[in-house]
Amino acid sequence: MKRSALAGMLLALVLVAACGRGQATARTTVRFWGLGREGEVVRELVPEFEKRHPEIHVEVQQIPFTAAHEKLLTAYVGDATPDAAQLGNTWVPEFVSLRALEPLDARIARSAVVRGDSFPGVWDTNVIDGKTWGLPWYVDTRLLFYRTDLVAATGAHWPPRSWGEWREAMVRIKQRGGRGRFAILLPIDEYEQPVIFGLQNGAGLLAGGGRHGAFRDPRFRQAMAFYLDLYTSGLAPGLDRQSIANLYQQFAEGYFAMVITGPWNLGEFRNRLPPEMQDRWATAPLPPPEEGMPYPGASLAGGSSLVLFRRARASEAAWQWLQYLAEPAQQARFYQLSGDLPARPSAWRLAGLAADPRAASFLVQLEHVAPTPKVPEWERIATRVAECAEQVMRGGRDLDAALAALDADVDRILEKRRWLLDRSAEETERRP
């Protein structure tokens, strides 16, 4: 009898242990790919999520930014995409065109994610063909970093409310600085500046639903002319990124008084400028083309979004993870870990950013940002824009000829897109 009771107890213990092991192995694993440093620090947010959701385990794979695009495409071709990932905003259209992503509208409608608690232009980067394909995770945009002492010495109206006021301030800075000194640094091989000026001036960049280039549009031509005048007038040096020896040292030495750059340089300026320079720099939103236009002028809607892959094996659990990352408290914590600006304005208050005057300029600017054209070919087109500007600046072509050639190049890049769109339209017309 005792042996029978003992055997029964042992059997019960074995069954309990087996059940425990079964419960442990029953956890759902979410495979998440993070890019660059974000892929490292996001791991710090996993323990709290798993504490809330003990049935879910998050497996984070960090991928270097330099290899991320190719790795994501390779994973798509090989049917090996993760459940969810971080995706640069300009990459979203490409993966939508591949049918690699799941639209999120139905999920968002049932969740605590609030579209109103976002920067409209940033949210819009994820909306393609009327559907939402990603949740903004962190944001960036570009505005002015400037030397307060050099600007104040000119007596110019600041911050400028138009391109004209801005140029007048730059002329005064150049006059005071003399030979070998410049008002602004604008690396000639960057596409962002001419595109920003074009968007501010109402240029669409592409026409026909993204079928053709529209860089000969008078609004873009005017923007490009303003941009190139900064070089021909000697207000900006004709340097590309490789020719800039040390941006922070040259800024401190007064080689240039201002630069258009992004939030990553908030930390860099604090860390790399000498102590005596720390009270001599500030940030300001970009001016619009004309006084009386909405202030500030538009800038680019950058950053990264959180996407769910169509072939996700654990889509429900992955959506729980993405919602968690989008919470204001987690975005504020992620800012503390990474320095990336939160995509939800409510998180700025939690992170203390709204009280920082240098960061506050970004808060103002982010309410006035616009996405680049939502076509998979955009990055190739952007490279052509920078090449076009450099050709004109170096005297290789006049502006009108360069813009005509740019439109021709862009039309060639978009040839396959035109064919696909036209074919889709024909098939739609043939349907009964």
Map each language-model feature to its residues.
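Short, solvent-exposed loop/beta-turn-alpha elements that line the ligand-binding surface or hinge
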Residues: 105-118, 183-184, 203-222, 271-276, ...
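Extracytoplasmic/periplasmic substrate-recognition and gating elements
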Residues: 154, 225, 229-237, 246, ...
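Hinge/lid segment of periplasmic solute-binding proteins
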Residues: 89-143, 167, 196, 278-286, ...
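Extracytoplasmic "Venus flytrap"/periplasmic binding protein-like
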Residues: 48-118, 152-161, 250, 254-258, ...
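Extracytoplasmic/periplasmic solute-binding protein
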Residues: 129-137, 142, 167-213, 256
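A structural signal for short loop-to-beta-strand junctions that line the ligand-binding cleft
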Residues: 74, 82-83, 111-150, 182-183, ...
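Long, aromatic- and glycine/proline-rich binding clefts that accommodate carbohydrate-like moieties
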Residues: 125, 281-286, 335-387, 391, ...
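Glycine-centered hinge/linker elements that transmit conformational signals in sensory
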Residues: 169-172, 210-240, 286-289
